[in-house]
Each structure stands twice: as structure tokens, then as C-alpha cells.
């Protein structure tokens, strides 16, 4: 499979994602500059973390207007697997490819730590090889990671099975103490209605090697392989 890792001015997680795909999965990955307008040659797309455009206005607000995002939207419509990590998640919500918004952390502080997340849905390409309730230990590093939707939309997300990851403690319980940023309902990641576009605040690409902290993130990245190949070879 061939992965695109989209790079914006200010991205800093692009090389992490590149190495996770190349070294962790053993698949081809290419850095794609924000001016690119055609992503059809790729099987999967990753929008990495960082501070695109310096987070001016708010995180992801300017990146949504980059030329590459029109291409991302086309591939999302075609059903291609797309993963937004941290700032990539923020960009996808700003582009309305994912529901909700990412606000300042409840603490008003930048949070850098390791957290537990629980897999809530396995209908997405990025969780297809995981069992519901699987616990993953992943790193976080963000200042605007508090996921928010109105109460009515939260009910819809839960009903539609769009909550993909939830912050929990080591026992798998979604407690207040396990919530690092004040996200509504301890939500760490969501998907679109179709399930092919996923965004999460934790960094799976920084957890692909057990010798440098853990390899739970590799389980997310590896899940896309079988589903991604099916999409790549389906009629467009």
C-alpha cells in the first residue's frame, strides 16, 4: 500500500508518521506538500500533527483552505481511508469532514503525557482489526484537544457509532481523572458517518516501537492494511 502524509507549513508530526509507516508497517509512504491537488495515486491519507500555519486564528482554521484539502475531500467522498492525528484531527473538523470541534484544554495548559484509550467502534478501516473494548496506551501532546459537540449531536454520534476512541483509566473506565483535556464524554476520536475518515488527538505514530515507549499505535495503523487494499482496488 502507498500512504500519503500531508505536510503543511508548521507540521511537526509528518516525519513521525512517515517513519511509522515505513519502519513499523514496512509500506511505502510519501510526504505530500500542502499545494498538492491530486491524491488519487495513494491508497491511504494521513494528516499528521503539528501547528499548521502556527495555529493562527485557531488550530486547523487556515489549513482547511490549503489546496490539498480539496483533494482530501474528494478522496474522502470516494471512501478512501483517511486519518487525522492531533492537528490533523483539528483540520478535519475545520474542513467539516468530521463532526465537532477541538477547543482549548479545560486546564488551559499544554498537556504532554501518555493516556489510555478504549476502542469503541471497529467499523472503521483504522480499527477493523481491533476488538471492541481494546485498551491502547498512546502519547498525547496538545493545547487544543478538548473535543466538543452540542448535546443533541453527541446523542447522534453515540447512536450512529461515530465515537471511535474514548479516554479511560487503566481498568478501561471513562473517569474524569482519565480525561486529559475535558473532552465531552471522554471522547478521544471520532469518525464520519461512513466510517472511512477518522480523527483522534492521541498519537499512534509515536507508539510504533516497544523500545521507545510502546507499540500500541501500530495496531491502529496496521488495521487499515486489509481494508485499504479493498478500497484501492474497487471501482471509483
Swiss-Prot record:
Active site: 86 (nucleophile), 203, 205
Superkingdom: Bacteria
Pfam families: GATase_5
Bilayer-crossing regions: none
UniProt keywords, alphabetically: ATP-binding, Cytoplasm, Glutamine amidotransferase, Hydrolase, Ligase, Nucleotide-binding, Purine biosynthesis
Catalytic activity reported: N(2)-formyl-N(1)-(5-phospho-beta-D-ribosyl)glycinamide + L-glutamine + ATP + H2O = 2-formamido-N(1)-(5-O-phospho-beta-D-ribosyl)acetamidine + L-glutamate + ADP + phosphate + H(+); L-glutamine + H2O = L-glutamate + NH4(+)
PROSITE patterns (alphabetical): GATASE_TYPE_1
CDD domains: GATase1_FGAR_AT (cd01740)
Domain (Glutamine amidotransferase type-1): residue spans on this chain: 2-234
Annotated pathway: Purine metabolism; IMP biosynthesis via de novo pathway; 5-amino-1-(5-phospho-D-ribosyl)imidazole from N(2)-formyl-N(1)-(5-phospho-D-ribosyl)glycinamide: step 1/2
Biological-process GO terms, alphabetical: 'de novo' IMP biosynthetic process
E.C. code: 6.3.5.3, 3.5.1.2
Record's subcellular location: Cytoplasm
GO-annotated cellular components: cytoplasm
Cited Gene3D superfamilies: 3.40.50.880
GO MF, one example: ATP binding
Function field: Part of the phosphoribosylformylglycinamidine synthase complex involved in the purines biosynthetic pathway. Catalyzes the ATP-dependent conversion of formylglycinamide ribonucleotide (FGAR) and glutamine to yield formylglycinamidine ribonucleotide (FGAM) and glutamate. The FGAM synthase complex is composed of three subunits. PurQ produces an ammonia molecule by converting glutamine to glutamate. PurL transfers the ammonia molecule to FGAR to form FGAM in an ATP-dependent manner.
HAMAP family membership: PurQ
PANTHER family: PHOSPHORIBOSYLFORMYLGLYCINAMIDINE SYNTHASE SUBUNIT PURQ (PTHR47552:SF1)
Subunit structure as annotated in this protein's UniProt entry: Part of the FGAM synthase complex composed of 1 PurL, 1 PurQ and 2 PurS subunits.
Protein name: Phosphoribosylformylglycinamidine synthase subunit PurQ
Gene: purQ
